[in-house]
Structure formats: C-alpha cells, structure tokens
Design a protein with these regions (language model features):
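Active-site acidic-Proline motif in GNAT/NAT acetyltransferases
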Residues: 87-93, 121-122
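Short coil/turn segments at alpha/beta junctions that flank glycine-rich nucleotide-binding fingerprints
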Residues: 93, 109-113
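Loop/helix-junction capping segments adjacent to catalytic residues or to phosphate/diphosphate-binding pockets
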Residues: 11-14, 93, 124
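C-terminal "cap" of GNAT-fold acetyltransferases
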Residues: 3, 113-116, 120-133, 137-157
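Acetyl-CoA-dependent GNAT
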Residues: 5-82, 87-88, 100-102, 106, ...
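Conserved phosphate-binding and hydrolysis motifs of nucleotide-dependent enzymes
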Residues: 62, 66, 94-96, 134
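Alpha-helical macromolecular-interaction surfaces
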Residues: 98, 102, 124-125
Length: 157
C-alpha cells in the first residue's frame, strides 16, 4: 500500500529524507557539489521547506520507497522539481508517477505557474515520465557542469 507523506520542518522523517537523498546521489554516480548537495542533505528544509517549497516521502507498506522535492526559482511563479528518486526494489509500483502527481498538486496549491527540472539524458524512463506529464525540452535555465543534462519545463500548473 502506497502512502505519501509531506515532510514538515519538525518531522521525524527528515532522517529518512537524508538517507533517500544519499541513495539518490549514490545511484547517479555524479558529483553534486555544484548544487551544495552536502548542505541540502544536512538541512533539506532550508531549500525545500515552507513557505515556497515542498518535500515528500513515499512509503510502500510503511517502508521508505522514494522522495521528491520542490523549490522556488528566482523568476516569479516558477518552481523546480528536485530529487525524484524511487528505490530500485519499488520501481514497479507507480511510485514515481504518484510522487510527480503529488508535487504537481503542491505546486498548484503554492500558486506556481510553471515548473522546471533538469535530468540526465541517460535517465530515459524519467524523461518519458516527465513527458507524460506535459514537460517539454527547453534551453538550459542554469549552468550544470554534468555531461548529458536535459532541461524541461511544464506550464500552467
């Protein structure tokens, strides 16, 4: 059974978030220091907390299965999807799709009008998922030094 929990600054699940973020980075096998990833792991709510952010953890039969986050960008009405991750053992249950839907709903509630994301070209299942939710390829909206980066955006949240 799937359960998605919105994480608050005082949530006991913050340690679960940290662990999921570390597993995400480990699976990517990329250096994320250009994104201040260490600081993000230390205090996820600084980047993804209220009033302009959101952070969710998915549980499958009460086992942590994945996460997703949202942060505000500098442009008015624009947010960014971050850290979509589902543990490999849970990838057959539609958890990634449910997390994306939860984040889109949160972005609407926070009155964002568009959402951006970046991903790696080699992550084709993720790109296909984003396309199913109306994300389109765009030019780079920030400098990402990793090879094979793909930038996407969805309007009208």
């Amino acid at each position: 059974m799937l359960r998605i929990q919105k994480i608050s600054p005082d949530s006991a699940a913050l340690e679960t978030v940290r662990q999921l973020f570390l597993e995400y980075a480990d699976e990517l096998q990329e250096n994320l220091c250009f994104q201040s990833f260490d600081a993000e792991v230390k205090d996820p709510m600084k980047k993804y907390g209220p009033p302009k952010g959101a952070l969710f953890v998915a549980y499958w039969n009460e086992s942590p299965a994945g996460c997703i986050a949202l942060q505000a960008l500098k442009e008015e009405g624009v947010c960014e999807m971050k850290r979509l991750y589902v543990k490999p053992a849970f990838r057959k249950y539609g958890i990634g799709r449910a997390l994306v839907e939860q984040l889109l709903e949160a972005s609407h509630e926070l009155q964002y009008t568009s959402m951006r994301l970046d991903t790696l070209e080699r992550l084709q299942p993720a790109i296909k998922l984003y396309e199913q939710y109306g994300f389109k390829l765009i030019n780079a909206y920030y400098e990402n030094p990793l090879p094979g980066v793909v930038y996407m955006e969805r309007h009208e949240m």
